[in-house]
Amino acid sequence: MKKIGLLLTIFSLCLGCLGLVPSDKAHAGNLNLTTWPSASILAVESRTVNNADKKLGEIGEKLDLNNSPLRSFRKYRGMFPTIAAQIVDNAPYEKVEDVLEMPGLTEEQKKLLEANLKNFTVTKTADVYNEGDYRLNTGSYD
């Protein structure tokens, strides 16, 4: 039985390689590059934006004192982890200058914060960044 199966397989392969088995021709796609999709199709497509991306659009390049995770403060020398943890623990803030009124700041820490005030912004707290201690541990370990 195995020999019959083997012979049938070899015979089928030989016929297929010789082209004796009838088959349909392949149908190629339309490669005409001058045809563009109609404008009506493009107008229907919409882009959805999640809440986290929407908040990032509000913030821009600055670091949001009410919503940024602890690890984001690493890009400012001397801020991570001590001052950054104090900022996160004492949030929310009404304005950027409120960060200078945190309890327990040394004069050196105040000077460091004053030097970086231009890099900070304050927006309303967003649940997407503050629920579940996300600001303390974002889950990215680089």
Swiss-Prot record:
Gene3D superfamilies: Photosystem II 12 kDa extrinsic protein (1.10.150.320). The keyword Membrane applies. GO terms for biological process: photosynthesis; photosystem II stabilization. Keywords: Electron transport, Membrane, Photosynthesis, Photosystem II, Signal, Thylakoid, Transport. It is found in: Cellular thylakoid membrane. Residues 1-28 form the signal peptide. Its main location: membrane. It comes from the Bacteria. It is a peripheral membrane protein. GO terms for cellular component: extrinsic component of membrane; photosystem II oxygen evolving complex; plasma membrane-derived thylakoid membrane. PSII is composed of 1 copy each of membrane proteins PsbA, PsbB, PsbC, PsbD, PsbE, PsbF, PsbH, PsbI, PsbJ, PsbK, PsbL, PsbM, PsbT, PsbX, PsbY, PsbZ, Psb30/Ycf12, peripheral proteins PsbO, CyanoQ (PsbQ), PsbU, PsbV and a large number of cofactors. It forms dimeric complexes. Belongs to the PsbU family. One of the extrinsic, lumenal subunits of photosystem II (PSII). PSII is a light-driven water plastoquinone oxidoreductase, using light energy to abstract electrons from H(2)O, generating a proton gradient subsequently used for ATP formation. The extrinsic proteins stabilize the structure of photosystem II oxygen-evolving complex (OEC), the ion environment of oxygen evolution and protect the OEC against heat-induced inactivation. This is Photosystem II extrinsic protein U.
